[in-house]
Amino acid sequence: MADEHTETRSGPTHSGFVALIGAPNAGKSTLVNQLVGAKVSIVTHKVQTTRAIVRGIATHKNAQIVFVDTPGIFKPRRRLDTAMVTTAWGGAKDADMVLVLIDAQRGLKGDAAEILERLADIRQPKALLLNKVDRVKPEKLLELTQAANARVDFARTFMVSALTGSGCKDLLDYLAETLPEGPWYYPEDQISDLPMRQLAAEITREKLYLRLHQELPYSSHVETEKWEEKQNGSVRIEQVIYVERDSQKKIVLGHKGETIRAIGQASRADIAGILEQKVHLFLFVKVRENWGNDPERYREMGLEFPR
């Protein structure tokens, strides 16, 4: 989709940061990838996949739009949850504009309702995005639009499908016209501010989430420990998957190493596609007890350690 988002520029340039907030699994990361036209944020069927702020950069008309994909907002149960939710609201308050993404199928229940209540603290201009509109009847969409706008003063409402891209061009047009005039923050061909080492670790974490079930993925953390550019043009990458207990390590490895092998193959293919280079990926699993309470791990993830 990247080519569809780039148009001939004339006149002054515009730029700004646009935060995307919403409940877990509302489709924020999928939408950011769609708007940017490339994979900059990992996506799984599990809630709370995004842990830290990821910035995806879209160039549209004469504007550079920096999308801030924030963790899903929900009632925290653990220290890591608290850090993620704090980061999400912080990302909204630091942005030039806030996009509030609501899953139209779920409506204004639970986490979505609480998010709307807290938006009174956000002074930035806000736009409402109803996602998955292709799965909801028009009458219900109208009801949702009226109900949400009755609670929050939204500047605009957009009907989108993060999966198909429907409605995305209208949203990009609006943002390009609305963001303030100013120079671009990043080179024109840059699509993310996430270092490649970190993005590679995120991709492996995505495959871990897709492969494993229940609570185990939430007890894991991936770090890229070595990155070596070879003379033949390939890349050697070594990553460590940290878990909290020996029993979890056995699950990640799988019977005769089948699980970690499958995770590695899937991750290698994605990383190679992004780098457009041959990738040699080596995964290791180590136990780091109680890593979820280690301030250093939070810093590595770009999160503030909750005291």
Regions of interest found by a model, annotated:
Residues 125, 134-192:
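Canonical P-loop GTPase G-domain recognition
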Residues 86-157, 228-231:
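Conserved C-terminal guanine-recognition region of P-loop GTPase G domains, centered on the G4
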Residues 27, 167, 259:
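Conserved glycine(s) of the Walker
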